[in-house]
């Protein structure tokens, strides 16, 4: 029964606006399966900030490291419960000041509802550093991300979350239908709205 539930949830989460799958299960020796701790031999750096949250299906993350570094590799990965996916960020999301600091402010990354943790693989001066961030969930039930919110609730087995999403989505659809019917039935009102949008 549990496998059937997982298969159904997997099918459900692959539908809707998030029609994409992770890169696949990583092999035993690959970076995505390394422990969530720093592998640097000399802790010559200081982590000042490492935060992330999900806002209606979009991942936001920010953080900073201070230390004397002249080169770096910034490699963020999404962890989908043992399945890793590389996240692609813009160059202006990362700010590097040689010899001083490395800061990142990643915005609007699409993640699937089965997202668990953000793993940051940093290579600073040849030392490999792993940072882990468990995102805070911020939900706006009135947003257009109703499908993502429903999928998230199904994956986490949070039926209250699913119920609230359905309630607010039903209200939005009802108001939209009432508006369309109200405007199209009354010709004078319809002409008034047309003049409003044309002007």
From Swiss-Prot:
Cysteines paired by S-S bonds: 52-133
Name this protein carries in UniProt: Unique short US2 glycoprotein
Record keywords: Disulfide bond, Early protein, Glycoprotein, Host endoplasmic reticulum, Host membrane, Host-virus interaction, Immunoglobulin domain, Membrane, Signal, Transmembrane, Transmembrane helix, Viral immunoevasion
Family, similarity comment: Belongs to the cytomegalovirus US2 family.
GO-annotated cellular components: host cell endoplasmic reticulum membrane; membrane
Domain of life: Viruses
Modified how: The signal sequence is not cleaved.
Its biological purpose: Participates in the inhibition of the host immune response. Early protein that redirects newly synthesized major histocompatibility complex (MHC) class I heavy chains via the SEC61 translocon to the cytosol where they undergo proteasome-dependent destruction. In consequence, infected cells are masked for immune recognition by cytotoxic T lymphocytes. Seems so far to be specific for HLA-A, HLA-B, and HFE loci products. Does not interact with HLA-DR or HLA-DM.
Pfam families noted in UniProt: Cytomega_US3
Organism field: Human cytomegalovirus (strain AD169) (HHV-5)
Cellular localization per UniProt: Host endoplasmic reticulum membrane
């Amino acid at each position: 029964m549990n496998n059937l539930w997982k298969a159904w949830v997997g099918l459900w989460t692959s539908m809707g606006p998030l029609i994409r799958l992770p890169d696949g299960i990583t092999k035993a020796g690959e970076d995505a399966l390394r422990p969530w701790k720093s592998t640097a031999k000399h802790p010559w750096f200081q982590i000042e900030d490492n935060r992330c949250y999900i806002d209606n299906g979009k991942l936001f993350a920010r953080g900073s490291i201070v230390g004397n570094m002249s080169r770096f590799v910034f490699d963020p990965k999404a962890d989908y419960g043992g399945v890793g996916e590389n996240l692609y960020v813009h160059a202006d999301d990362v700010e590097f000041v040689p010899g001083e600091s490395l800061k990142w402010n990643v915005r609007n990354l699409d993640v699937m509802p089965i997202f668990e943790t953000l793993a940051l693989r940093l290579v600073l001066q040849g030392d490999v550093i792993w940072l882990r961030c468990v995102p805070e969930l911020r939900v706006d039930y009135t947003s257009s991300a109703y499908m993502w919110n429903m999928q998230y609730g199904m994956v986490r087995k949070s039926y209250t979350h699913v119920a609230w999403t359905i309630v607010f989505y039903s209200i939005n659809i009802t108001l939209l239908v009432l508006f369309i019917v109200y405007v199209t039935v009354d010709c004078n009102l319809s002409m008034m709205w047309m003049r409003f949008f044309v002007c």
